[in-house]
């Protein structure tokens, strides 16, 4: 009887040892083998291409392949679409759902954001793919990368709200103040 008891206990211990073998925490890796960007993992922004729209709406073909219609809330007092609406342009939209419809809290025309921007102390180019190049050698802490995260523009380590994005003007605001840039050549 003791042999059966010890035999069953040894089988139980072996089962526990083998079942715990693979319980080490695994590092979070993307399919490409790179560590996931902690900033992009909590991004609530919807990215896509505008396929149609009107005065108060944008129909967006998202990067996931979905087609979504976003409306401008008639109660909004501020302009929620920054950079204009042109079919075929890339957009970053922060939205919310109300009464079964998708509404825009903010929409940034990424195509309008690309290009050369300059001010008295900065002269830079925002390029596709998240890179920024600076034209001034004397510039302190030049921006080298950009991304949109939760409706905010991140230039290297600086985070900005886009106050205005027009054909020739870009106004950015953060805790240090408002920065106005004009379209360069």
Model-derived regions: residue spans:
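Positively charged n-region of N-terminal signal peptides that target proteins for export
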Residues: 1-5, 22
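Sec-dependent signal peptide hydrophobic core
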Residues: 5-13
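C-terminal motif of bacterial Sec signal peptides marking the signal peptidase cleavage site
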Residues: 16-19
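Lipid interaction determinants
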Residues: 21-47, 52-185
């Amino acid at each position: 009887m003791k042999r059966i008891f010890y035999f069953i206990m040894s089988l139980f211990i072996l089962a526990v040892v083998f079942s715990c073998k693979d319980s080490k925490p695994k590092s979070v890796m993307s399919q490409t083998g790179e560590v996931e960007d902690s900033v992009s993992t909590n991004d609530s922004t919807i990215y896509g291409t505008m396929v149609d729209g009107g005065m108060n709406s944008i129909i967006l073909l998202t990067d996931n392949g979905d087609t979504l219609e976003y409306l401008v809330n008639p109660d909004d007092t501020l302009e929620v679409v920054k950079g204009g609406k042109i079919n075929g342009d890339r957009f970053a939209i922060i939205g919310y759902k109300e009464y079964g419809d998708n509404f825009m809290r903010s929409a940034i025309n990424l195509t309008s954001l690309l290009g050369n921007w300059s001010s008295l102390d900065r002269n830079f180019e925002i390029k596709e793919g998240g890179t920024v190049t600076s034209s001034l050698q004397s510039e302190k802490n030049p921006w080298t990368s950009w991304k949109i995260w939760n409706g905010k523009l991140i230039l290297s380590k600086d985070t900005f709200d886009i106050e205005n994005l027009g054909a020739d003007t870009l106004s950015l605001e953060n805790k240090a103040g408002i920065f106005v840039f004009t379209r360069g050549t």
